[in-house]
Amino acid sequence: MIIANNKKAFFDYFIEEKYEAGIELKGSEVKSIKAGKVSIKEAFVRIINDEIFIMGMSVVPWEFGSVYNPEERRVRKLLLHRKEIKKIHEKVKIKGYTIVPLDVHLSKGYVKMQIAIAKGKKTYDKRESIAKKDQERNLKREFKNNNR
């Protein structure tokens, strides 16, 4: 079940490889995320000392939590196998590649994040993808009208 989606990532980047990572969270953060109070629009991923962290992810403090609720935009560790981290690190060293958060979802009761290795699109690529979507939309509309 997808809780938060980063639609802008598909528009701004060419997605190459996807990975599912766990997120190191506090108890009240889990409850808040399950309530849908999370945003990954400004989030980005960094590799620091062979560990992957998500920064800029906003988790609204749980309303029934105590005064010890964690910060809304604190740095959270992503949980991946060491082989996956090494593979991602090698790919990101290449110029033009970055790690992008795609969505936050539940998997077997655990909060997971789908991240991807991506390459940035140029403005002409973005225009091309918009034109392609418009063309597909027009084709669907024509087929729908022809079937009536």
From Swiss-Prot:
Pfam families tied to this protein: SmpB
A molecular function (GO) held by this record is: RNA binding
What does this chain do?
Answer: Required for rescue of stalled ribosomes mediated by trans-translation. Binds to transfer-messenger RNA (tmRNA), required for stable association of tmRNA with ribosomes. tmRNA and SmpB together mimic tRNA shape, replacing the anticodon stem-loop with SmpB. tmRNA is encoded by the ssrA gene; the 2 termini fold to resemble tRNA(Ala) and it encodes a 'tag peptide', a short internal open reading frame. During trans-translation Ala-aminoacylated tmRNA acts like a tRNA, entering the A-site of stalled ribosomes, displacing the stalled mRNA.
Sorted keywords for this record are: Cytoplasm, RNA-binding
What name does the UniProt record give this protein? SsrA-binding protein
Q: Which family is this protein grouped under?
A: Belongs to the SmpB family.
List locations, semicolon-separated. Cytoplasm
PANTHER family according to UniProt:
SSRA-BINDING PROTEIN, TMRNA-BINDING COMPONENT OF TRANS-TRANSLATION TAGGING COMPLEX
Supply one GO CC term from the record: cytosol
Organism of derivation = Fusobacterium nucleatum subsp. nucleatum (strain ATCC 25586 / DSM 15643 / BCRC 10681 / CIP 101130 / JCM 8532 / KCTC 2640 / LMG 13131 / VPI 4355)
Question: Which GO biological process annotations does it have?
Answer: trans-translation
Where is the stretch described as Disordered? 128-148
